[in-house]
Amino acid sequence: MKEQKLIHEGLITESLPNGMFRVRLDNEDLILGYVSGRIRRSFIRILPGDRVKIEVSSYDSTKGRIIYRLRNKDSND
C-alpha cells in the first residue's frame, strides 16, 4: 500500500545549498524542502519569497518535497 502524503502550502524563507529550501508553512511550521525532479527538469526557478505547494510525509514532518511553485498575484507575467 502506498504511503499517504499531506500537501501543504508555504512560503520559501531561505535558500540552502543543493536545491534545499527552508519553508514556512501556512500553519507556521518551519520545515526543510527539496525540489522535486519534475521541477528540476523543467528548470523552474524557486527563490526566497515564492509560495509553493509542498508534499510532506506522515512519517517525517520535518522534511518535504516541493511539487509546485504558485504564481504571484501581483506580478505582471
UniProtKB/Swiss-Prot annotation:
InterPro entries: NA-bd_OB-fold (IPR012340), RNA-binding_domain_S1_IF1 (IPR006196), S1_domain (IPR003029), TIF_IF1 (IPR004368). One of the essential components for the initiation of protein synthesis. Stabilizes the binding of IF-2 and IF-3 on the 30S subunit to which N-formylmethionyl-tRNA(fMet) subsequently binds. Helps modulate mRNA selection, yielding the 30S pre-initiation complex (PIC). Upon addition of the 50S ribosomal subunit IF-1, IF-2 and IF-3 are released leaving the mature 70S translation initiation complex. It comes from Drimys granadensis. Transmembrane segments: none annotated. The keyword Chloroplast applies. Residues 1-71 form the S1-like domain. The lineage of its organism: Eukaryota, Viridiplantae, Streptophyta, Embryophyta, Tracheophyta. This is Translation initiation factor IF-1, chloroplastic. The keyword Chloroplast applies. Component of the 30S ribosomal translation pre-initiation complex which assembles on the 30S ribosome in the order IF-2 and IF-3, IF-1 and N-formylmethionyl-tRNA(fMet); mRNA recruitment can occur at any time during PIC assembly. Keywords: Chloroplast, Initiation factor, Plastid, Protein biosynthesis, RNA-binding, rRNA-binding. Belongs to the IF-1 family. It comes from the Eukaryota. It is found in: Plastid, Chloroplast. One of its GO terms (cellular component) is chloroplast. GO terms for molecular function: ribosome binding; rRNA binding; translation initiation factor activity.
